[in-house]
Amino acid sequence: MTDLWHHLAGAAGIQLTEQHHAQLHRYLDLLLKANETINLTRITDRTAAEIGHIGDALTLLPFLPKGSHGLADVGSGGGVPGIPLAIVRPDAQVILIESTQKKAAFLGKTIEALRLRNVQLFIDRAESAAQGPARESFDVVTARAVGAMNLLVEWCLPLVKVGGKLLAMKGAKVIEELADADKIIPKLGGGLPSIHRVNLPGTEHHVIVEIPKVSKTDAQYPRPPTIAKKRPLD
């Protein structure tokens, strides 16, 4: 999958080095080994993981700002897309937000093993993090397999600074999900979403939803943990 990685990075003007490759492969080693005892990913085949994890993460590169910026990966789980992006973009200051203790423990060990000095771990829910110092502090917030758009935007947009963006990695139901969220996004300070279709070998209906942050989020959002799931905004 070396050619695929080079192609995806090249689309953002990035030349992958031997060190990039070594760290990306080492990350996959750690992820797949830990997955034997912790439920981190449904992808267990190495080649599929090279596409579905590393390749998937690298599709976000063209949407990241040039130069140093702050990025939060909400519900980071096994570390995708946050860790691959941190490896390839060492000028990005990446925060992995994960509330599940076992997953957070894996992320902490992986950050240390890969010596990723530009990565920090927040063991917290996005709703709680967004009511603290992290509120509206990130240029980019990413989310992959975290929840439907009507929930995702309440959890994530309060973390994005005005002028920044939310990048949500979605699948076949994206149009339906956006229809459910179209009145919610402006309430949270979001602008008009853009849908970017991405082609990855062996995958279908892969899209990146880009939502700009155009105004501050009202202080009442996000609501306390679990409330969004029980009573989604409309």
Describe each model-derived feature in a short phrase.
Residues 127, 148, 171-175, 199:
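Short "lid" loop at the C-terminus of a central beta-strand within the Rossmann-like core
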Residues 103-105, 174, 178:
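Short alpha-helix immediately C-terminal to the canonical SAM-binding loop
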Residues 31, 85, 170, 211:
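Residue-level signal for inorganic ion chemistry
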Residues 1-72, 102-122, 226:
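Class I SAM-dependent transferase core
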Residues 179-234:
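SAM/dcSAM-binding transferase cores
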Residues 89, 160-162:
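Helix-to-beta-strand junctions that scaffold the AdoMet/dcAdoMet cofactor pocket
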Residues 163-173:
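Conserved beta-strand signature within the Rossmann-like core of class I S-adenosyl-L-methionine
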Residues 55-147, 153:
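Conserved SAM/SAH cofactor-binding pocket of Class I
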